[in-house]
A protein has these predicted regions:
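Acyltransferase
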Residues: 24-29, 58, 271-294, 317-322
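Acidic/His- and Gly-rich active-site-bordering loop/insert found
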Residues: 53-55, 63-134
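A short helix-breaking turn/cap at a secondary-structure junction
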Residues: 188-275, 322
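An N-terminal boundary/leader segment
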Residues: 1-54
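Short, well-ordered beta-strand elements within core beta-sheets of diverse protein domains
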Residues: 13-19, 79, 97-102, 207-214
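Flexible, acidic loop-helix segments that line cofactor/substrate-binding pockets
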Residues: 43, 234-241, 256, 262-264, ...
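Short helix-loop capping/hinge segments that flank enzyme active sites or metal/cofactor-binding pockets
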Residues: 73-93, 249-257, 303-332
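Short glycine/serine-rich loop segments
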Residues: 105-229
Length: 332
């Protein structure tokens, strides 16, 4: 048994499973203990069922001891953003409109996780309908600070050592922003790599699924598991996919070169953020070329907002029409 196993990355836990130093039950119990100790302050979880998770962990351990085939995430607990349909768990989308909502439908990405042997520990908090209205989730490093949104709970849960992996979604920075705020790895792969089937739709043009973890290898592994073609997602990619984990662990074949754009909103950054960026650019030295973006780049923020607002009004028209009094003023 490994003490404080909740601190392990998914890759470390898988190695410990293989060597017999750790069981899935021990890991899940450790994660649940960490949640009980800290989530009153962080509020990362919208739904948690420890008993079901432990039953799944026991089955994972039984399969492993029997020498049967195991998947890439066998016995690893994972959190899901609460806009992803998961049979036998509520999907409430951060709004009282869907309080207690359950469906028999299972998102394709949930099927992929279960096929890989992952344990769905519960649902992580999202902003209202995965849009802009903030929730109660706090930043694990400082409860006075925001964890970022809209995948607030997923990023906070990984940063607080509640789970080694979590799934989020991004329409306007909703994976990479909370990952940055909470200090975790966040990865939003190419559009169409991970199926959106069974995920709340707010913008057919912009919605995407992403991953959170505490190491580069972990987010690569999770992306490999989730990635697949899905005929029910109109943008799903049918082309061959590179193995992300292999790529993440390989040496770069050439010295990478980078372009740095001084964006129109850099003047809004804090002094600490600007100093940090400049320090990285100085370390990279000749590998970086500083470039000035076109003036029209500033218009992209307005364009993105118009697309998002128009499409969420389309996709959720029935919800808005029938429940207008339960919609926040910010979303209205």
């Amino acid at each position: 048994m490994i003490q404080d196993s909740y601190k392990l990355t998914a890759s470390e836990a898988l190695d410990a499973f293989a060597s017999g130093r750790l069981s899935s039950v021990e890991l899940v119990k450790s994660c649940i203990g960490q949640i009980k100790a800290t989530d009153d302050r962080i509020k990362a979880w919208a739904f948690l069922d420890g008993n079901v998770a432990l039953a799944q962990a026991e089955e994972c351990d039984r399969i492993r001891k029997a020498g049967l085939a195991t998947g890439a995430l066998h016995g690893i607990p994972v959190g899901l953003k609460d806009i992803i349909d998961t049979a036998k768990m509520p999907t409430q989308c951060g709004t009282p409109i869907f309080s207690g909502r359950r469906t028999d439908h299972v998102a394709r990405l949930v099927e992929r996780l279960r096929e890989a042997g992952a344990i769905i520990l519960g649902k992580t908090v999202t902003t209202e309908l995965a849009f802009v209205h903030a929730n109660e989730t706090r930043n694990p490093h400082n409860p006075d600070h925001s964890p970022g949104g809209s995948s607030s709970g997923s990023a906070a849960a990984v940063a607080a050592f509640h789970v080694p992996l979590a799934v989020g979604t991004q329409t306007n920075g909703s994976v990479i922003r909370p990952a940055s705020f909470c200090g975790t790895f966040g990865f939003k792969p190419t559009r169409g790599v991970i199926s959106r089937s069974g995920v709340l739709q707010t913008s057919v043009s912009l919605d995407q699924v992403g991953c959170f973890g505490r190491s580069l290898a972990d987010v690569a592994l999770l992306t490999d598991v989730l990635g697949c073609y899905d005929q029910y997602d109109t943008v799903s990619l049918a082309r061959p996919r590179p193995n992300m984990l292999t790529g993440a662990q390989a040496e770069a074949p050439v010295t990478p070169e980078f372009a740095w754009f001084d964006l129109p909103f850099n003047d809004r950054l804090s002094t600490d953020a600007r100093d940090g960026i400049e320090a990285v650019l100085e370390i990279l030295g000749p590998q970086v070329t500083r470039m000035q973006p076109a003036d029209t780049l500033a218009d992209l923020v307005t364009v993105q907002a118009r697309i998002h607002e128009y499409e969420i009004a389309q996709h959720q028209a029935e919800v808005f029409d029938q429940n207008w009094d339960q919609i926040s003023d910010i979303l209205k």
